[in-house]
Amino acid sequence: MTQDKSIEPFFLNKVVDKSQLRQLIIWAFRNYGIARASNMADTLKDLGFLYATKAGISLSLEDLRIPPAKNNLLKTTIDLINDTDTKYRKGEITAVERFQKVIDTWNSASDTLKKQVIKYFTEKDPLNSIYMMAFSGARANISQVRQLVGMRGLMADPQGQIIDLPISSNFREGLTITDYFISSYGARKGLVDTALRTADSGYLTRRLVDVAQDVIIREADCNTSKGIVLESMIDNRKTLVSLHQALIGRVLAEDLFNPAGSKLVAKLNTEISPDLANEIISLGISSVLVRSPITCESIKSVCQSCYGWNLAHGRIVDLGEAVGIIAAQSIGEPGTQLTMRTFHTGGVFTGELAQTVISSSDCQVEYPSNIILSDTRTRHGDHAFLVEKDIKLKLLDFNKKQTSLSLVKGSLLFVKHLEYITSGQVIAEYPISNRLITEKAQKAVLADFSGSIYLMDLSVSNIQSEQQTFKNVIKGGVIWILAGHVFSIPYNTQLIISENDFIDENHLIGKTEFVSRYEGRVRILKKKQDFIQDIVIITSSKTYINIDVLTKFYNGYTNHFLITNQQDKFILKTLPNQTIVDQQLIAELITNIYRTNTGGIIKYLDLSVSDKKVDLNSKKDYYDIVDGGYVLWIGEETHEINKDISLLLVSHGQLIDEGTEIVKNIFTNSSGIVDIIQKEGIVREIIIKPGILYPHSKFYDHKSKSRGFLKPGEIISNDLKTDKLVYWEYFYVKNQSYTLIRPVIVYSIPSKTIQFKYSADSFNSHICSLKLVKRIYFRDGERVKSVSGIDIVKTYLIAELNKDSLNLKCTLQLNLDSNNRSISRMRIVTMDKLSLKDENNIASTKDLYTRTRLLVTNNQYIKSGTVVAQTELFSSLEGQVVSIQKNKSSNPRILLITSLDTKVFSINNNQNIKVNINDLIYAGDEIATNIISYISGQVISIRDNQITVRLGQPYLISEGSFLHVNNQALIQRGENIATLIFERVKTGDIVQGLPRIEEILEARKKSDSFFNPHVVLDSKFRQYVNQGLNLYDATRLSLLILQLYLVKELQLVYQSQGVEIADKHIEVIVRQMTSKVKIENGGDTDHLPGEIIELQKIEMLNKALRLASKEEALYYPILLGITKASLNTESFISAASFQETTKVLTDAAISCKLDWLRGLKENVIIGRLIPAGTGFNIYNNMQLNYQDEKYSYTKNLLSLPQNTKNLNFEDIIVDDRNAHMYSRNNNL
């Protein structure tokens, strides 16, 4: 590369992988410029191609080598899990602790296997194709290799919870059906995430760009003395960002001295290069004060010194650089990487294992004197000591060599004072990162078998809610389930057995009787299904012999007509064999007596009607006619139209004939006087009123009404009298008054009933009967708008059911008359139906079976209360009935102890019995000399050299859980006996980072988050104000604390995903989020309370007010999310182009806002040159003058080598180290 012969090249025998290659190219770029670095990258590419094409690397099944250690590892893991299950079965750990232990054991196994895979490839097969691909960075990653040749490991279900059954096989061995289905959750989630989260990532970038697009480097130095302290970022004892990495490209905010002496290392405003950063680290300096965009005092911009290097070029950032856009893209772009990564791993769980401290040799542990410990229980249910403050343990080996071990507060200690430990033993466990968000979760404890409940050492309190009472566990203990067969018996079963009875196989336990509530005739129906027998009890039957039913077929329709002995003809409205309900319409009388030709006005005369009712089918109101009377009908034809009055073909008051066209294509059906109702030139109705117009008579002047009836003999006009009942009303035509006399039709409605006759075989006829009902659908005085006419009164036959028989099924049947086959007879039947299970039907459990016997015969007439059938319940097991429980909320239960529920241990006379009757024993307990019980349970008998133990299962229940059973309760297998409440870490796939980033940047006020930034900002501000700081300083300091926290939080999320982002990018965004304050009191400014304004702007106003001795504005700092910050930007054009366009522009118009076009977006929208890059006007900046610039260029020119003839430039297109140094005066 270089022509300097004094530098000797050195040979380095090392594998150059992806990261080494990156470092090499960065070094070449930083030291030799872009042209030489590009050339070197080109030659490296050629070298790579040369060797890559010498031999093709293929992938075959043989390359997928499974490490031999896998089988032993799986065996060890399964043994550990079996030990955990044994502990659980002995009631030593809870279901939650068992689950956590199983998860952690498999997770640890998966992690160990991953290391074994790497070790195997490295040591045994370094030229393996898959190993070379993965570890050179060409293709795949360690997670994928692990799944190919190690084990797939634990998977997450659709809710994000871990399934405790891992996939122990890999893709090389192949998956079982179970493995495949467990895998499918993550696979689908990966595909969905790829689609959805890509959009989320893009939207995040858009919001970031919008919030920071106006941040441009506008000046060289803001001359601030402020800065931020940089340290290594450490989380959970892991260095995420080293101090060296954080320092490169920064500018010192103070002189830096060697801590060992007073020697100056670097001056104020010195740029920190990699060499200087190395020197700072080598001197042991752990924190450095540097300039930062957060503390920059430039107005509406950032200065060069506070920003530092442009990391792309490795030199100070240029003036006019749009650093806001760069920052937004730097933070937003990795979002896509976070998204895509889930797809590759397919939902494989990557949980955080607690970091354990393992002894490297045999030694003795010694506690320090100041140690403070408290007893605790680990999440696996083991006993441990909780370290209450940071300590140092002494470890003494057998050679008295001493080493120390530091433990932080919150660590778990597993060894006692002066205890001897072996190599590989776990000494302690560091606390899992407290940054993980936990959530309250529930775990149901289900009964593994049926039996009775025994509560041991549990303290319970009742909590009453609106719906039910909960039993809350105050002090933890054990729930025992003592085995037995539990039968749930139907509620109405009559038991034949009692407690302590011994029953044999096929013994009768109880019986259920089916009793008829009604008397009637029995009909045993033909079976439709093999095991169900239907019985019908006909409670009433009524055949009408004075009604003939004629059936007629027309156009595919069947109509049934009823003809009474009075020759009234009805049409049947209910289909035969259809269920009938009370007050159902059965038939309608066919008649035209009450049919009108048109609409009109209806008036009742001596007509008694019921209260208004509603027809459920048509939703119309109707009235039943209670007693006979008359209906008066004043006919009129009403046409409802909505047309302009100019389209009318008739005029108001005109007498027209039938068939007259009143509007185009609308003709009248009757003759009469035209009455036009119009509104604002639009005709609403045209009414044709039959009658005669008479000139106005003084006879009507004394009447207070404008319409009414005239009886026969009353005066119409000028001694003209009426000879019948008529209707009169005032009528105005062209401002002249007339009297319109209209004819009245009188409809007589007599009272009428039908006397029905029944056949001799009818019985219980009072249960259901038919009733003749006349019904009117219009109220008194109602005006019916119609053209064609209506039925004023309709006559129906209605079914009436006895109130006690409403639960019965009622049907209408048509049977052919035996004497005359052309007619049918109508029969109404009511019945009660019983469905009985057949004799051979087996009950839902194999331990019980039933037999059902019919106790009646077909056509038998029975009384109410007769037993129709009996179901008998038999046990298929033999044993002792220990308990019979009855309670109001559930069916009775029987507990039967059989030989299957007990275990007998035989002993001889020489063995001592170590248990008593009713003792509870655990698996592994010694019950007699040299006899170890391999089961848990209760001793129920000791006699004849035999110990009988009833099988049992203890369940450990932790404090705070909810209990669902009572002591001595009987439960069946699979029932929930308790719900454990515990805290768990919120798990998720690898993309969990993206929502967290969004949550921080949007400054969401989440209740379940362990840190609320809004609360912290407010409390810090109040604290500083109370300490006596002025408003500006209190705001600045509280904002600075929050800014540093937000930067760290965002870095933690990205670093945990393996994504590196320079702090300065995040600082630029955070600066925008924290640049505003909210006015509390405007003082003598023009600002109103609640207004959001820039901190720098309000402080300048306050300075001016202070000089003028006026009242200053009061304010407090606020944190705005990126969306809110974008909408609250000074430029309304930028805000409107982002979101809520109408609102933003309306607000700007009302407020008469000005847009100074400072940012990029607003200039692009207007069509101006953007104020960045070449569009940045350097001459407007007073701090930079042409002389300074000229001097710096000249100085740089002088530093160029004078003798350039000896330099070899043939590999350089443009030497970018020198190109930018030429003066503008040079003619290039």
Curated annotation (Swiss-Prot):
Cofactor requirements of the protein: Zn(2+)
Matching SUPFAM superfamilies: beta and beta-prime subunits of DNA dependent RNA-polymerase
UniProt family annotation: Belongs to the RNA polymerase beta' chain family. RpoC2 subfamily.
Domain of life: Eukaryota
Protein name according to UniProt: DNA-directed RNA polymerase subunit beta''
Main localization, broad class: plastid
Binding site for Zn(2+): 222, 296, 303, 306
Pfam family, one: RNA_pol_Rpb1_4
